[in-house]
Amino acid sequence: MKRDDKTRGAAASSAPVYGGDFDFDTIRMIALDLDGTTLTRNGLTRRTKETLEEAIRRGIHVVIATGRVYASLPEAVKNIQGLQYIITSNGAHISDAATGEILYSDCMEPEAVDLVLEILPQEPYPVEVFTGGKAYIARNIYEDLAQNGSDFMSAKYVLRTRTPVDDIYALMREHRDAIENINVHFAAQEARMAMWERFAKLPHMTVTSSTHHNIEIGGVTTSKAAALAEVCGRLGLELPHVMAFGDSPNDLTMLRECGFSVAMGNATPDIKAAADYVTITNEEEGVVYAIRTLLFREKDGVPPRASLRRRLAAWMRGRR
């Protein structure tokens, strides 16, 4: 049985308990989103790295499935011992974790890129283009972020991981047959949703997001689930053997199609509703908690920071 509907989408409590009857012995792979899921604001924690490496030693494959391009991956993630595959750009590429070699590619169709080029140059929104494993942004946007910051883009992250170019649309035309993903950023939700709906009506592409201020345009067959199916095929597994973790709409395909899905405590409502289980937040190392309690069957998989926070909260409640 895949899931117990009574536990599907249940809100995470201070110590979330899984009440279903899923057979966790069938899990042979863990698929992990990065931002808002595996990473905290300080990156990959020691405890998370140790837990993932322990899972690998136990014979469970660990696969990263992120919206980032390969060049934007933290070194700590690539250095997880035993990690074989990394899915990037929402499924556009699968790379060898040790060498960075691209093993699989499902980029946007050139016709889809042409349709995007008919629209975006007429709009004022910041655009990022993912191609060749790197992320590019217009130089004027890059310099403005460096000088003034932004209320709706992570200036520090963009400045660290993006390459500025003079003409972002010329780059898009030049690489129209190798575009992994196109990110568009918005200050206003009304504009974001209007552009989402506009692109969603067009053929040859998909639209998703990983933050409340962006949309991510990808290939019509590109998704984290499709890339995971490819990885499974290489390992002699199937998607029902996979436990997937995520927090945002670009994780939805793999959460729906994998054997067991885990939403983070900080996930969007639609992701929580789609999941079999809701763990604690990424800042509380919710990936660690879920793996240790569900897969390793430890009685208390709560990371020390989260446990201390809860004891403090209980003490404060007792004083009221």
Regions found by a protein language model. Give the residues of each.
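Non-catalytic pre-domain segments flanking phosphatase-related domains
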Residues: 1-32, 57, 316-320
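Short active-site oxyanion
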Residues: 59-63, 82-84, 181, 240-241, ...
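Mg2+-dependent phosphoryl-transfer enzymes with acidic/Ser/Thr/Gly-rich catalytic loops
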Residues: 20-29, 45, 200, 215-320
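Short hydrophobic/aromatic-enriched beta-strand-loop microsegments
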Residues: 83-89, 149, 207-208, 261-265, ...
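Conserved acidic, metal-coordinating active-site core of Asp-based
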Residues: 119, 130-245
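Short, acidic loop-to-helix structural element flanking the phosphoryl-transfer center
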Residues: 43-60, 105-112, 165-169, 221-233, ...
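Active-site metal-binding loops of divalent metal-dependent hydrolases
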Residues: 36, 68, 91, 246-248
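Active-site phosphate-binding/coordination module
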Residues: 46-152
